């Protein structure tokens, strides 16, 4: 008898359960084969970002199987076998590891096959209400559905989700199939034909669970032919109280995402460019916050320049400090000064035993020979205290000259500011007379000092800006106003945004009276893509799917290539191509659309003019082709 450990443990059963990744893979293959390859005019959104379409699945083969096996014979099991016998589907089925996963895939594929049965009350279509330029899948009713009736074949498969999977789907913006179970209080992911049902604040259907992994849509009110089947995603799914909802109910009520955005005067003033007034804006406001703080904390009366200057980089110039210290070490006691200097400018001079007279312009000892250094500084007069402390520390280790007697050195170091605005000049004159009092260094130190001063004159370096004193720019309002995407009810129909080519135009469908964009409309199509696809698959005009009783003598068209899909020349001549069907101003919604202009009595007085125009266009097209 096998032990309990040898039996199937819950971990093994959990490992074999249906997961989100497996179900997403099944759904991508099923929608690619049975929706996108069934004469569909666009591609549905896939769950995997890098999905590659299955090779070996051809559109004509899929349509033939659906027509003969599903629509006419009503044998979905035989259609399933023929579909799985195709080379692309056979390869995918062979890659599945075990029989259990193969059964899961067949079960999920069967849901998409059954929605093509003639008794199915819905079909997949598209809408551009939400994004204007891109068509999203939707569910449209082609039969009348009573209130409380379970919508046949509009079902899906549920699979529980983990927190990591939910966050990943949120980042990929593929979270439109997440539902919250009211019984389990956990999020689940559902896929299948029901995933194409969009949200509406006044939905005509609701999602109900069937078993542990099934989900069905039940009609909450009567649904008429041509009406979109919708469900409710939640009260706060599109923001708080669905404030960003773009459903049809909100469009008719002009609320939430369709509400007009009225900009206040404050908002418009913030969006506009501020007017710079020299009297209203002080110079301190043009400086960085660190510099402004330094001015407020210091006791000096130094005012910044009247014109704002660009702040250059600050670099440590050790040679300047070394020369200043070496000249100040042998200076005797000097006379007092009437104007005490600011602390920010005298911090570069080390303390001496004597009381030297220090001013903002000159430093004058008592008597003797003079050393004058006149320098026009291009740097800011308010240097950072932390940098000054660093430089003071380095200057304490520098050597002093041994003997300097009756030496007069005059070096003028003028640094021309390369910036757009001139900098204020600060003159520092050092007049030093002293006697040789220390013989610790050789007399060649004078030449070293001169060479260092010449290096300062010849190679002026831009001050290097430290990381701490980085210029922090304030937030400057933009010159252009922010372009808020304001939606207007009906702005997704008869708009010029979808007319990319010269011969693209809006055309009115002769079957369902819905406006659609026809690309390269050299000849006008009679039906919209939905009605034309329905006719190609079922052989009848939309929404008819089968004969309506024994008295119906209309024959099904088994070969769609025998049907003429364009207007006849006499019908083409009555169509107005003015403005390519674009309506300016507020475009009405499809339900409240204006009457068709492509009728027999429209522009009857201009038949001859339209006929000539059509002949001219035809002749020019023939010449270009």
Curated annotation (Swiss-Prot):
Residues 269-286, 372-386 have a biased composition (Polar residues). InterPro entries: Hist-Lys_N-MTase_N (IPR041938), Set9_fungi (IPR025783), SET_dom (IPR001214), SET_dom_sf (IPR046341), Suv4-20/Set9 (IPR039977). GO terms for molecular function: histone H4K20 trimethyltransferase activity. It comes from the Eukaryota. Gene3D superfamilies: Histone-lysine N-methyltransferase, SET domain. One of its GO terms (biological process) is methylation. It holds the Pfam family SET. This is Histone-lysine N-methyltransferase set9. The lineage of its organism: Eukaryota, Fungi, Dikarya, Ascomycota, Pezizomycotina.
């Amino acid at each position: 008898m096998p032990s309990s450990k040898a039996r199937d443990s819950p971990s093994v059963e959990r490992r074999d359960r249906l997961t989100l990744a497996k179900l997403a893979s099944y759904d991508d293959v099923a929608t690619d084969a049975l929706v996108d390859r069934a004469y569909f005019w666009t591609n549905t959104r896939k769950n995997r970002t890098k999905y590659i379409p299955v090779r070996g699945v051809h559109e004509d083969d899929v349509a033939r199987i659906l027509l003969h096996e599903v629509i006419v014979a009503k044998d979905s099991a035989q259609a399933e076998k023929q579909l799985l016998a195709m080379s692309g589907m056979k390869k995918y089925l062979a890659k599945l590891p075990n029989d259990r996963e193969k059964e899961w895939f067949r079960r999920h594929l069967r849901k998409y096959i059954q929605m093509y049965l003639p008794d199915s009350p819905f079909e997949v279509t598209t809408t551009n209400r939400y994004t204007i330029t891109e068509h999203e899948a939707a569910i449209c009713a082609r039969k009348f559905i009573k209130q409380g009736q379970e919508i046949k074949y509009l079902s899906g498969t549920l699979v529980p989700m983990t927190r990591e999977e939910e966050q990943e789907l949120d980042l990929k913006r593929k979270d439109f199939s997440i539902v919250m179970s009211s019984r389990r209080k956990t999020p689940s992911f559902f896929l299948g034909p029901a995933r194409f049902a969009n949200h509406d604040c006044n939905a005509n259907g609701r999602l109900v669970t069937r078993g542990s992994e099934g989900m069905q849509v039940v009609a909450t009110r009567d649904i008429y032919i041509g009406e979109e089947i919708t469900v409710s995603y939640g009260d706060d799914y599109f923001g708080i109280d669905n404030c960003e909802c773009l459903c049809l109910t909100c469009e008719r009520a002009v609320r939430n995402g369709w509400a007009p955005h009225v900009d206040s005067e404050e908002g418009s003033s913030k969006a506009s460019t501020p007017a710079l007034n020299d009297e209203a804006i002080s110079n301190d406001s043009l400086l960085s916050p660190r510099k402004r703080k330094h001015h407020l904390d210091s006791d000096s009366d130094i005012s910044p320049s009247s014109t704002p200057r660009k702040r250059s980089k600050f670099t440590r110039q050790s040679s300047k400090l070394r020369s200043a210290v070496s000249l100040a070490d042998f200076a005797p006691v000097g006379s007092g000064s009437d104007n005490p200097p600011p602390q920010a400018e005298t911090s570069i001079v080390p303390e001496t035993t004597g009381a030297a007279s220090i001013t903002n312009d000159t430093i004058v000892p008592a008597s003797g020979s003079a050393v004058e250094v006149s320098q026009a500084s291009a740097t800011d007069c308010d240097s950072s205290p932390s940098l000054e402390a660093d430089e003071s520390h380095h200057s304490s280790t520098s050597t002093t000259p041994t003997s300097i007697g009756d030496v007069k050195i005059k070096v003028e170091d003028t640094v021309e500011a390369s910036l757009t605005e001139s900098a204020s000049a600060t003159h520092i004159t050092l007049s030093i007379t002293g006697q040789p009092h220390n013989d610790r260094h050789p007399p060649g130190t004078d030449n070293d000092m001169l060479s260092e001063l010449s290096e300062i004159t010849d190679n002026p370096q831009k001050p290097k800006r430290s990381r701490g004193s980085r210029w922090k720019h304030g937030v400057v309002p933009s010159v252009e106003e922010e372009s808020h995407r304001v939606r207007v009810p009906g702005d997704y129909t008869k708009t010029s945004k979808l007319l990319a080519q010269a011969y693209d135009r809006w055309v009115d469908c002769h079957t369902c009276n819905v406006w659609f964009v026809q690309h390269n409309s050299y000849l006008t199509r009679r039906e919209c893509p939905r009605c034309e696809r329905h006719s190609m698959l079922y052989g009848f005009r939309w929404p008819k799917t089968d004969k309506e009783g024994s008295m119906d003598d209309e024959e099904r068209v088994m070969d769609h290539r025998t049907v003429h899909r364009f207007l006849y020349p006499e019908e083409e001549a009555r169509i107005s191509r003015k403005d390519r069907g674009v309506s300016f101003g507020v475009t009405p919604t499809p339900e409240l659309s204006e009457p068709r202009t492509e009728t027999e009595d429209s522009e009857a007085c201009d038949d001859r003019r339209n006929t000539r125009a059509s002949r001219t266009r035809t002749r020019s097209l023939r010449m270009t082709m």
